[in-house]
A protein has these predicted regions:
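Extracytoplasmic gate region of multi-pass secondary transporters
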Residues: 60-61, 264-319, 377
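Helix-loop-helix hairpin linking two adjacent transmembrane segments in secondary transporters
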Residues: 170, 174-220
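Structural signature of the two symmetry-related core transmembrane helices
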Residues: 107-121, 336-351
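Symmetry-related core transmembrane helices of the 12-TM Major Facilitator Superfamily/SLC fold
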Residues: 196-213, 427-445
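Conserved MFS/SLC helix-loop-helix module at the cytosolic interface between two early adjacent transmembrane helices
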Residues: 91-127
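Helix-breaking motifs and short loop linkers at transmembrane-helix boundaries and internal kinks
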Residues: 72, 104, 125-131, 159, ...
Length: 463
């Protein structure tokens, strides 16, 4: 495990300080005036990892009608594929969080990306539906394992001032991968064959794994150290708290660590809200091309292209606006309040996308929904990082991703099952809406605890 900074570095004149930045390296001069003292490459590299993860997971959504025709399975079984994969991922997430707090994070991420590429090739080689189903479970299980080490690494490279933008890069890659996977899956399946979809997608994974090796392992707690040094310059030190939660890395059980983290009220709210959000988003992106194909009489290629292109545009807009607004203001509970508004916009947009007839109206509302969801995500991720002490961020993000993954697991299955029961896929899409409004309520209830929880986390990181 990489140690947290053992001694508080001294400030130099001119707004710089010497401190150890990398796990294997000497001290170096750090400019405290820069928003991102170590540049944006670590965030970009992790964004590429998040992108290829979601591309490989969502290829099946774009090619789903063709794959259904080949293997002959129902909508319920189609929805069960991502559900089973997500449950498998959830089982591994808490151990992955423990690993992220103890093992080199860069190396862990590289191995995970290589496993994705291998599973993508195996998907294309499957000769029976059972083989295909099992490989998709494997890639789903591996798909979420990059998140705890990647999120922990970003929190160390980027102090609070730039943390929202850093997570914005990662969330942008993640959410752009959703429509990109849908578009690629639909286009390649229509032009070539559904097997070619998975063979082609394996190649970028190898390239991104090599790029990730250029990122050096940072010292744990580095971002928090920079925040404390900046506070010293202004004469306003981060407040200490008597209500200290001991979350240092120990030999405690996974469940004991998780229970300790869930004492943080803001984290509980963020986790539950993201779980409800994930249910809606997972169901939306998985079934949207099929929804458009059946209700608007579009072909597979056109439906996938519209779903991915319009959704991707909304995501880009939401990420840019959300991350900039989140980092710009520091008023009480700002990130949580901003996220609440963004999720409300997204929930309303998705409701109208399902209810309003016509391709143009539906796609305009899909863009609005995606912009709202994407605007919330970097701020929720940054808020989670800010309320969890540095030594336990890997476990904290694993817990967040664990429950979020479980929430998202049932979105595609819910839509598919309701489609089979009612005979109309629109009813299944309507069932995604109540959880989204519930996520808005959950965030609103914890908005007042964010600043106190962030202060306690900062105090814990300094011990």
């Amino acid at each position: 495990m990489t140690d947290i900074q053992p001694d508080e570095p001294l400030l130099h004149q001119g707004g710089s300080a010497r401190l150890r930045v990398h796990a294997r390296g000497d001290e170096q001069e750090v400019d405290l005036d820069r928003d991102a003292p170590f540049g944006w490459w670590p965030a970009i590299a992790i964004a590429l990892v998040a992108f290829i993860d979601r591309v490989e997971i969502n290829l099946i959504a774009g090619a789903l009608p063709v794959i259904q025709d080949h293997f002959g399975f129902s909508d319920t079984v189609g929805g069960l594929i991502p559900t089973a994969a997500s449950i498998a991922a959830a089982v591994l997430l808490l151990p992955a969080g423990r690993l992220a707090d103890r093992a080199p994070r860069v190396g862990t991420i590289v191995i995970v990306v290589l496993v994705w590429s291998l599973c993508s090739v195996l998907s294309g080689l499957a000769t029976t539906f059972l083989m295909f189903f099992m490989v998709r479970i494997a890639i789903g299980a591996a798909g979420q394992l990059y998140n705890p080490p990647a999120s922990s690494l970003l929190a160390d490279y980027y102090p609070n001032r730039s943390r929202g933008k850093a997570y914005g890069f990662e969330r942008a890659g993640y959410y752009m991968g959703l429509p990109a996977g849908v578009i690629i899956g639909g286009a390649v399946a229509e032009a070539l064959d559904w097997r070619a979809v998975f063979f082609i997608a394996a190649v970028p994974g190898l390239f991104i794994a090599a790029l990730m090796l250029t990122v050096k392992e940072p010292v744990r707690g580095l971002g928090d150290t920079i925040d404390r040094l900046r506070a010293q310059r202004t004469g306003v030190a981060p407040p200490e708290s008597e209500a200290h939660v001991d979350l240092s890395v120990s030999s405690a059980s996974l469940w004991a660590d998780a229970k300790e983290l869930l004492r943080i009220r803001t984290l509980r709210g963020v986790i539950l809200a993201q779980a409800m959000l994930a249910l809606g988003v997972a169901g939306l992106f998985y079934w949207l091309p099929t929804f458009l194909e059946r209700l608007e009489d579009l072909d597979t290629d056109t439906a996938s292209g519209l779903a991915g292109g319009v959704g991707g545009t909304g995501i880009v807009i939401g990420i840019i606006i959300g991350s900039r607004l989140g980092d710009r203001h520091e008023s009480e509970g700002w990130r949580i309040r901003l996220s609440t508004v963004c999720l409300l916009v997204g929930a309303i947009g998705l409701s109208l996308a399902v209810l309003l007839p016509g391709v143009g109206l539906r796609m305009a509302m899909v863009a609005l929904a995606c912009a709202g969801f994407a605007g919330a995500m970097p701020n929720l991720t940054a808020a989670a990082a800010n309320v969890v002490p540095a030594a336990s961020r890997g476990m904290g993000f694993a817990l967040l991703q664990f429950l979020t993954t479980l929430g998202g697991a049932f979105g595609p299955l819910l839509v598919g099952a309701m489609s089979d029961v009612t005979g109309w896929i629109g009813y299944g899409m309507l069932f995604l809406i109540p959880p989204l409004f519930l996520s808005v309520v959950l965030l609103w209830l914890v908005r007042g605890s964010y600043d106190a929880d962030a202060a306690r986390a900062s105090a814990s990181s300094s011990h």
